[in-house]
Regions:
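A short beta-loop-alpha structural element at the N-terminal edge
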Residues: 7-22
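Conserved GNAT acetyl-CoA-binding A-motif
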Residues: 111, 118-129
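Conserved catalytic-core motifs of GNAT/GCN5-like acyltransferases
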Residues: 125-130, 142, 147-163
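Helix-loop element at the rim of GNAT/NAT acetyltransferase active sites that forms part
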Residues: 22-39, 55
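Short glycine/proline-centered loop/turn elements that form peptide/ligand docking sites
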Residues: 107, 111, 134-137, 154-159
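Acetyl-CoA-dependent GNAT
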Residues: 41-100, 111-112, 171-173
Length: 174
């Protein structure tokens, strides 16, 4: 991390299910910038373990965990957009970090690990959507090479009102 504290990144395993669910619930309660509200997650620990096992065994999808002092502090993942030939080159990236650890370099480390994985998996384009008001996330994504390619003014219908989404992509073959 920026302050010199060690941060360990590794692929999630099914044994991480309880901690990943805890982290998911916390991160999704701490901000209105993520896709879901905590209560919308219906995954049980067994469901999460099955999901993580599939990611662990996949050649083209992954969930990466960030640990500080043995505690899971954030996750990021790569998911194929689809299996059809015309879109097989594209993957989507998602990331969530506990608020206590924002601005400490974990996000950048997770992003770089995801980008490296996506390249090795053979993807040519990584995509993400970010709430336009999430300026720190937009700066992070731009810092690692993502560029805006569109906007959706009514992308999220949050409890607080409409949230504009910025559509971003990183071309991995350039």
């Amino acid at each position: 991390m920026k302050d010199g504290t060690p941060c360990v990144l590794r692929g999630a395993t099914e044994k991480d299910a309880a901690e990943v669910l805890r982290c998911f619930s916390l991160t999704h309660a701490e901000t209105d910038f993520l896709l879901t509200y905590p209560e919308e997650n219906s995954f049980t620990e067994a469901d999460e373990a099955k999901f993580l096992k599939a990611r662990e065994e996949s050649d083209n999808e992954i969930e990466i965990c960030a640990f500080v002092d043995g505690k899971l502090t954030g996750t990021a993942g790569i998911e194929a957009i689809g299996g059809k030939e015309k879109i097989r080159h594209r993957a989507e990236l998602g990331i969530a970090i506990e608020r206590e650890y924002w601005g400490r370099g974990i996000g950048k480390a997770l992003m770089l690990a995801c980008i490296e994985f996506a390249k090795k998996a053979g993807y040519l384009q990584l995509e993400l959507e970010v709430v336009a008001d999430n300026a720190s996330a937009v700066r992070l994504y731009e810092a690692v090479g993502f560029r805006e390619f569109g906007r959706n003014p009514r992308g999220f219908r949050a409890r607080s009102g409409w949230q504009e989404l910025i559509l971003m992509r990183l071309e991995l073959d350039k």
